[in-house]
Regions:
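Catalytic glycan-binding domains that act on GlcNAc-containing polysaccharides
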Residues: 2-208
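Short acidic, glycine/serine/threonine-rich helix-capping segments at coil-helix boundaries
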Residues: 163, 209-219, 223-271
Length: 278
């Protein structure tokens, strides 16, 4: 079994906290789509994993551009007719050839990063262009997982995973043929592995904490909230109760009630605990 880089696990926690998603959701999708591999070495650079879809490219071209792309084997009206090379370096070279014909159409025809989100979704995910979406993916694991989070939220898919409706998620994410791909089984197994990875990987000291975080840092946060007079379970799992208590604390202290234990909130909690000592 491939080892998962701590960078990806921490990115899932950060993005999950920022987007109010359990990090298991982001990790599970990444495990199925890219084995949670955030980067490949391409020409000495760290680049996100990509997959080029020639039928998307074909639809986004017309006239001479489409003729050139088809003649070069870069575009086809049929899905799967343009094969993806095995290596990421070769895929990036293919993308470069497509971009020489039409950069925006080429970037819209690629699935990007850990969650393999299509560049074609750039507008509904809040980007100015497909190139801007690609730049977000190329910024690092956080950017890639943020793309995944935006897509899951836009499609109302995250709740299906949280509810462990793996078949319902697979149908929406992978298509009606999901059983042939065993996508429901894959995402269920990935969910269990993501859960175990988060349990086994401690939260980095000083990291922001949000829904889905767990471990000693969450336990300490819950104890501090309890000492501050907020009723909640002290169990090391950041769920609805912890979020509600944290929002109440933030409102009381004049902080933005985000429900995320950021640096300012943690400092306020630490200050309150220090002030309570005799």
């Amino acid at each position: 079994m491939t080892m998962i880089e701590p960078e990806v696990i921490e990115a899932a926690r950060r993005v999950g906290a920022a987007r109010e998603l359990p990090p298991e959701v982001l990790l599970a999708v990444s495990l199925v789509e890219t084995n949670a591999v955030a980067h490949a070495r391409v020409g000495g650079r760290r680049e996100p994993l990509i997959r080029f879809e020639g039928h998307y490219f074909d639809r986004r071209l017309d006239g001479e551009g489409r003729e050139r792309a088809r003649a070069a084997g870069l575009a086809s009206p049929s899905a799967g007719a343009v094969a993806n090379p095995a290596s990421q370096a070769a895929r990036w070279a293919l993308l470069g050839r497509a971009a020489a014909i039409d950069t925006e159409a080429a970037y819209a025809s690629v699935s990007w990063g850990l969650g393999q989100v299509m560049g074609a979704h750039w507008q509904r995910l809040g980007f100015a262009s497909a190139r801007a979406l690609a730049a977000h993916a190329r910024s690092g694991a956080d950017g890639q997982l943020d793309l995944c989070a935006r897509f899951l939220l836009a499609e109302d898919l995250a709740d299906r995973l949280v509810a462990k409706d793996f078949a319902g998620f697979a149908r929406r994410y992978n298509g009606s043929n999901y059983r042939a791909n065993r996508y429901d089984e894959k995402i269920e197994a990935a969910w269990r592995r993501a859960d175990a990875l988060l349990d086994a990987s401690p939260v980095a000291p000083g990291a922001a904490l949000g829904r889905g975080a767990r471990g000693q840092a969450v336990f300490d946060l819950q104890e501090a909230l309890a000492e501050a007079g907020h009723g909640l379970s002290v169990d090391g799992v950041f769920g609805h109760g912890t979020e509600a208590a944290l929002r109440a604390f933030q409102e009381r202290r004049g902080l933005a009630p985000s429900g995320i234990a950021d640096a300012a909130t943690l400092a306020a909690l630490d200050g309150g605990r220090a002030g309570s000592c005799g």
